[in-house]
Amino acid sequence: MAKMLRVGKITNTHGIKGDLKVLPLTDYFERFEELEWVYIEGFKDKFYIENIKYKPTLVILSFEGYGDINLVEKFKDRYLLIDESQRRILPEDTYYIADIIGLDVFTVKDEYIGKVVDIIQTGSSEVYVIRMNNLKEIMIPSVKEFMPEISLEKKRITIDPIEGMIE
């Protein structure tokens, strides 16, 4: 089976006509308009998107054939998934979170630091959480000054930390 990517989390129902509140896991809410269908975590079938509405922090979705709250209750707290073929092409130096998590991190002197275990969205930029061999976690801002190279092909990130950043 193709690698599945999370694009949203169903947080609750909305009204009685089968609408679902979805917390997008993307900066580009309109992304859902590009999708004809999605998977729902734990279900094998494709769910065809019938209607999309936007709230400031949520997307309201409905699926074909699911026009009743009783049919969609079971979807609460599950992730919306797409397969890799539905991925958007991202601009240069922009990455999917799923592609960054798990990458090895080295300094510019080729010293192994650890693995990326999480990414925190701060508004202006992202902060990568790196778990070191001693299980200590450090945070490195995802800016060129501290992160001169991200290579998905090599499955590694090169950082140029300032004094005290990785201690």
From Swiss-Prot:
| Single GO biological process annotation from the record | ribosomal small subunit biogenesis
Keyword Cytoplasm assigned to the entry: answer is yes
Q: Which NCBIfam families match?
A: 16S_RimM
**Keywords for this entry?**
Chaperone, Cytoplasm, Ribosome biogenesis, rRNA processing
Q: Which Pfam families match?
A: PRC (PF05239), RimM (PF01782)
Q: Which species expresses this protein natively?
A: Alkaliphilus oremlandii (strain OhILAs) (Clostridium oremlandii (strain OhILAs))
Q: Which residues form the PRC barrel domain?
A: 92-165
Recorded hits in SUPFAM superfamilies, A to Z, give:
PRC-barrel domain, Translation proteins
- Where found, per UniProt? Cytoplasm
What protein does this entry describe? Ribosome maturation factor RimM
What PANTHER family is this protein classified in?
RIBOSOME MATURATION FACTOR RIMM
Q: What is known of its domains?
A: The PRC barrel domain binds ribosomal protein uS19.
InterPro entries from the UniProt entry: PRC-brl_dom (IPR027275), PRC_barrel-like_sf (IPR011033), RimM (IPR011961), RimM_N (IPR002676), RimM_N_sf (IPR036976), Transl_B-barrel_sf (IPR009000)
Which GO cellular component term is one of those annotated? cytoplasm
